[in-house]
Amino acid sequence: MVTGMIIKKIKELTKEEEEKIINRNKANFEEILPTVMEILKDVKEKGDEALKYYTKKFDGVEIEDFKVTDEEIEEAYNSVDYKVVEAIERAKENIYFFHKKQMEQIKDLNVENNGIILGQVVRAIEKVGCYVPGGRAFYPSTVLMTTIPAKVAGCEEIYITSPPTKDGKGNPATLIAGDIVGVSAIYKVGGVQAIGALAYGTETIPKVDIIVGPGNIYVTTAKKMVYGEVAIDFLAGPSEVLIIADETANAEFVALDFIAQAEHDPNASCVITTTSEKKAEEIKNKIFEEIEKAERKEIILKALENSAILIGDLEECIEFSNKYAPEHLEILTKNPEEVLNKIKHAGSVFLGEYSPVPVGDYASGTNHVLPTSQFARMSSGLNVETFLKKITYQKLDKESLKNIADIVITLAEAEGLFGHAEAVRRRLK
């Protein structure tokens, strides 16, 4: 049963073993690129006709009108348990709270330096496309996570695309979440064709300025290929967690959090680093106890191939975590805040035994759209700044222009741009 799962001391890992763990799930875009490019080309050239063709081909349903109607939304409310609606409402409040606090930290700037007025103004991106996955499951939580930061940022138009259900409708909980946030429109289209529609525009779906949201490798590849036509958030892959656990950690909680991540996807990656060999053995045993009871057992067993339990002192665990740059990082130690101070790379961090990853997935208020596959080394998770631009400005009078004219003229002429130099020189005559 333990086949494929590495259990070893960190300092005894071979180079190949360490690379296998750290370089997890590197997407092979090249294999599927021809398929993705063909679909994108068709959507660009044929618009809604291509959307209908690929929706029938991949989703098995014929759809004439992709835009969700008010009647469909009303029907969704009638088909969903009120507890789900209430949970969406409460999650929305927490997510709004945190992202509004983020927004409060982002301010315009106006300063003076040697008589020059310098500044920046913050402006929202106008049109946003939010991709919400479907297929194995539907994710109303992703509706909240992608649309609320855009709302808080002040984006004028926010559109959702999400795959249709087998009866050609939108998933009820997804529709309700979009309605509760108050998006501009929801479209029943998924996959590469949805990304193409948002990037290029069709008769039904407007072209946007930025596309955000997670998806499978086809969706991710499509986002990669339309970047430049539109902005994107980042390229996200299968879900992942790294847990730092010392001897005080509750082995059952560690095992449950491992299972919670592994059940997402057979390609999910789960790594536990612990300071105690005894704790490592205890955690391993608890994991396999929980697997026997799990509903998504086959998926979890497959995910074990991307998993490891590693043993080292606390500094080695922290160093390994920073190399790994996890999407989710749980710190289950005596003093988790002290460990956090040494963390350089992570999408989102969960401190202490009562802060499991699922709270961030749904309701704590932070965002669950996070960088994977080491992208946390250079990317932040989705946040209000994803949907903002900072426009700089400057204002000089004749005196302040005179103070820097020699710098501008000298550098412009050194670069052979004599028109640049003359634009300054003439103003000072």
UniProtKB/Swiss-Prot annotation:
Class in the EC hierarchy, top level: oxidoreductase
Q: Give GO terms: molecular function aspect only.
A: histidinol dehydrogenase activity; NAD binding; zinc ion binding
Cofactor(s) for this UniProt protein: Zn(2+)
In this chain, substrate is annotated as bound at S239, Q261, H264, H328, D361, E415, H420
What are the recorded Gene Ontology BP terms? Answer: L-histidine biosynthetic process
The protein, known as: Histidinol dehydrogenase
SUPFAM superfamilies recorded: ALDH-like
Q: Which family does it belong to?
A: Belongs to the histidinol dehydrogenase family.
Q: Which gene encodes it?
A: hisD
Q: What EC number is given for this enzyme?
A: 1.1.1.23
Q: Where is the active site?
A: E327 (proton acceptor), H328 (proton acceptor)
UniProt: NAD(+) binding residues: Y131, Q193, N216
Task: Provide the cofactor note recorded for this chain's UniProt entry.
Answer: Binds 1 zinc ion per subunit.
Which pathway is recorded for this entry?
Amino-acid biosynthesis; L-histidine biosynthesis; L-histidine from 5-phospho-alpha-D-ribose 1-diphosphate: step 9/9
Name the InterPro entries for this protein. Answer: Ald_DH/histidinol_DH, Histidinol_DH_CS, Histidinol_DH_monofunct, Hstdl_DH
